[in-house]
Design a protein with these regions (language model features):
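N-terminal lobe/hinge region of extracytoplasmic solute-binding protein
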Residues: 1-35, 72, 159-160
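Aromatic- and charge-enriched surface segment that lines or borders ligand/interaction sites
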Residues: 30-86
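Gly/Pro-rich hinge or "lid" segments in bacterial periplasmic/extracellular proteins
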Residues: 101-105, 112-115, 119-187
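Sec-exported extracytoplasmic/periplasmic mature domains
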Residues: 15, 19, 46-49, 72-80, ...
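A bilobed periplasmic-binding-protein/Venus flytrap-type ligand-binding module shared by bacterial periplasmic
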Residues: 177-180, 194, 226-251, 255, ...
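Ligand-site clamp/hinge motif
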Residues: 145, 172-220
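A structural "hinge/loop" feature
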Residues: 1-8, 27, 54-60, 125-138, ...
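Structural transition elements
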Residues: 266-300
Length: 300
């Protein structure tokens, strides 16, 4: 989606993913992980500032407090952030999301201006990787408050912490730029397909020379598509050994389904299959049409 592509280029977080798939420091110099893997400490680079629209410098420095504010805002009940579920391992996350504890109780603190500490209630082996998600990007609280509810909705209310900055924002899309460096792309034009021209995403990109276009029409295209999805946790069996028995797998699967307890706080929902609720095919909800495919006690 155009908004996700914009976020990934306008904002940088604590870490970044390299071309070979590994994680490397981005806005931080380094990080440390405790032996029990419940505490992550990041040491931010000194002298970093946000960039305003048109590439103008800003007076807003990037500090540990910006990440604290971003994560606390993520878990405010009124924010309804889709990224809260990704960071459910943070200490007190469910209670904060449910409004049972204040945002300050969330497991993220600024020990020093450039020292950020995350505290987890249980280990999450994918925690570092999740810090590359748009929801984990820094946000200056003073600037956020100054926008009076328009943060990120106009060029004037958008600050960049990434390699690109917002050059222009019109009704048809966004234009991002960065300083020229070698053979690297120094501009991105992101157009949302909301016109009545009937053009597909591929036609918009080819005819209007756009970098990316949002299109939910489902029209086949030879262009690369970028999508995102929620996470489904499932129980998988190695069918090459003792679990080659279908009856045994069904028995264990039904037992696990009946024993699972969905955590409260609104972060999780029970899965009735790999395809979640809300996915429609020709206007028909797939999950409702297919039903619950999980084996039940007493199935032959």
């Amino acid at each position: 989606a155009a908004d996700v592509i914009a976020c990934e280029n306008l904002y940088s977080g604590l870490v970044r993913r390299t071309p070979d798939g590994s994680l490397a420091p981005e806005l931080c110099e380094r990080w440390e992980v405790s032996a029990d893997r419940l505490t992550y400490t990041f040491y931010l680079k000194d002298g970093l500032t946000y960039t305003a629209s048109k590439g103008d410098p800003s007076d807003y420095a990037i500090t540990a407090e910006d990440f604290v504010f971003a994560f606390q805002r993520m878990f405010l009940p009124g924010t309804n952030s889709p990224y809260a579920v990704e960071f459910s391992a943070l200490e007190n996350s469910a209670a904060v999301l449910a409004g049972q504890k204040p945002a300050s109780a969330l497991g993220v603190t600024a020990a020093e201006p450039l020292k950020l500490v995350f505290r987890l209630s249980s280990p999450d082996e994918t925690f570092l990787s999740k810090l590359t998600l748009p929801g984990a990007m820094p946000c200056d609280e003073a600037f956020f408050d100054s926008t009076r509810g328009t943060y990120g909705l106009t060029s004037a209310s958008t600050l960049s912490s990434g390699h690109f900055y917002l050059y222009n924002w019109t009704s048809s899309g966004l234009f991002l730029r960065r300083a020229a460096s070698g053979n690297q792309i120094d501009s991105l034009r992101l157009v949302e397909n909301t016109t009545s021209s009937g053009q597909s995403a591929e036609e918009l990109i080819n005819n209007e020379k756009c970098t990316a276009a949002l299109d939910d029409s489902g029209t086949p295209t030879s262009l690369q598509s970028v999508s995102y999805s929620d996470t489904t946790w499932a129980l998988l069996f190695n069918c090459d050994s003792i679990f080659a028995s279908t009856e045994l797998r069904q028995a264990l699967g039904s037992a696990a389904a009946s024993a699972v307890e969905v955590p409260g706080g609104g972060l999780f929902a029970e899965a009735k299959g790999l395809i979640p609720d809300g996915l429609t095919v020709d206007g028909i909800d797939y999950r409702q049409a297919a039903g619950d495919v999980r084996p039940a006690f007493g199935d032959p």
